[in-house]
């Protein structure tokens, strides 16, 4: 009987060390390596407060997910709880919306991977690179989830090594009172690595409070993959041990990897001169004589994008599997099929096939603008899903399943409203920026139209 059950459930192949590194990989995105200069220019040293504020909100948000998963780790996704506690129609809307978001992430990350590889192989067709990389990651995802965990483990280690290298470099330069002459933002700068670069003339909002809110947007969307750890519970060997540990270490990781890296950059360079359009990591490593710094950081962001695509394929596959088991059972039964390795194989085929839209976009650039707009709209759906998840958590607390002795969210009556307010501020601010207004409006239109469809659909 046990063997039969195993053949009908995704297999538990993820070890504790995999979960810890998956949590790190979900915390660190390409935005830190490529976009740190832009966020620093928007609000100066107070950018660290933006990361801390959003980091606190995301930590408590993950604690709400962790509390539900700890109580019932058999669920294949944290989204399953939406159906369980907020109703089947809300669950239908949320899971389909989240699946759509993840598919768009797959396409976007595959395109990014191709661009990064062309840094070294500029004459190789982008569409060919995309197909080869997708085939490789598809192959990895057909193996036992333990292999997925190993891949993410080493992807995360590369990112961690780059950040720690930056922090150690800053400590050495500051401690040695390192003086340098370099060109930043078109200006010749003579300066010394010092903490004074951060604290002298400090202003909380040097470019106004609105730019600080704009930085909150960028930080929020840099953190949107952190909930991925909630997709791994059903395939973790000992979720009641590993999940709490991984989630509780998130604040330390944010302080070390984000705040630590940003402080390191701003200690070396006066923030006024840090260019918004160039990676500060490249500038720092070039400063200490690493001539191939650009290639090094390109390798890091390549592994980061590959990690994001790998995780997104994993997530889209499990989400479709969960959808097929909970909703539309007649039409989606094929997606409940598991391979011998315990992988929802047909769901993986579907996610991979849709990811092939990336090389199609490369070959037919005329439709790329429409895709970019749709991708921007779906990115904002992350926040819609987060709001629904918060509501679901509150419904769980009122249900008979509530476990007062579990992995409890600290001060939930304070934490949940705080999270909701931060998320609401970020979402509302999207309507006051020309670049984000229409994508935010598109997310609302999707929510209204598909929400009504989900409400009236026979399920």
UniProtKB/Swiss-Prot annotation:
Intrachain S-S bonds: none
Residues annotated as transmembrane: 19-39, 42-62, 97-117, 119-139, 153-173, 212-232, 254-274, 281-301, 341-361, 370-390, 412-432, 436-456
Keyword Transmembrane helix set for record: yes
Pfam families: AA_permease
Record keywords: Amino-acid transport, Cell membrane, Membrane, Transmembrane, Transmembrane helix, Transport
Subcellular location: Cell membrane
Membrane topology: Multi-pass membrane protein
GO cellular component, one term: plasma membrane
Superkingdom field: Bacteria
Coiled coil feature spans: none
Family matches, as InterPro entries: AA-permease/SLC12A_dom (IPR004841)
GO biological process: amino acid transport; transmembrane transport
Signal peptide boundaries: none
Keyword Transferase: no
Disruption phenotype: Deletion mutant shows a significant growth defect in medium that contains only free amino acids as a source of amino acids. Mutant shows a strong decrease in L-serine uptake and cannot transport L-threonine. Can still transport L-alanine. SerP1/serP2 double mutant is completely devoid of uptake activity of either L-serine, L-threonine or L-alanine.
Role noted for this protein: Transports L-serine, L-threonine and L-cysteine with high affinity. Stereoselective, with a strong preference for L-serine. Is the main L-serine transporter and is responsible for optimal growth in media containing free amino acids as the sole source of amino acids. Is also the main transporter for L-threonine.
PANTHER family: GABA PERMEASE, TRANSPORT PROTEIN YIFK-RELATED
Stated family: Belongs to the amino acid-polyamine-organocation (APC) superfamily. Amino acid transporter (AAT) (TC 2.A.3.1) family.
Listed name of the protein: Serine permease SerP1
Native organism: Lactococcus lactis subsp. cremoris (strain MG1363)
